[in-house]
Amino acid sequence: MADHPLVRCERISKHFGEGETRVDALRDVSLDVYPRQVVALLGPSGSGKTTLLNIIGCILDASSGSMALDGETVLSEGRWLKPNLRQLRLHNIGFIFQFHNLIPFLDATDNVALVLQLAGEEAGAARARAVELLDYLEVGHRRNAMPAKLSGGEAQRVAIARALANRPRIILADEPTAALDSKRAGIVMDLLRKVAVEQEAAIIVVTHDEKIFDWFDRKFTLRDGRLA
């Protein structure tokens, strides 16, 4: 494949506790995800999917292993090489969750714009970018709506816009369609594929949702912390 992987994990392991209480959540997990790919992390509850997603998202420390994001090594032998992981997340990684977690007292536009303002962008420019993203995700007609007035599918599209605000090339989604019916889940997955192709992004989705399995380019299955 001509592109370098946007996400490369090499022998990632994670354990919690020590001695008799030690739990090995991940064991020597290696995988690559390339631009324009939408991939799934599958497996039963407790298999390590969310743990791996949180390590890729620079939220959780690994016990050992290495990781490169967009060609740059950020984790080596279980040690972070970047002093400011918050800035790394803010500018390189977008997060989408099962429940959209939109701020209830901000309208759709301001929910998206807030991410940009936290990164230092001027309010007017942040709102303009938010409107552009909402239009791109076909929910621009609801830009002034409060979260309580949005349908589940609309709210998740606003959450996707928020994840895209800082133009990340790596997008991590944890059960993004679990609360949606088949039609709305399909719309969300179509939009994620559009983002992957047009933005040359790598999208990793943790899911148990069988109705979206056909949307993925690749599927990685974890069992007992190992890739099956």
Residue positions per predicted region:
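Extreme N-terminus of proteins, especially the signal/transit-peptide cleavage junction
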Residues: 1-5
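ABC family nucleotide-binding domain
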Residues: 6-222
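A short acidic, often aromatic-flanked loop/helix-cap motif at beta-alpha or helix-coil junctions
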Residues: 228
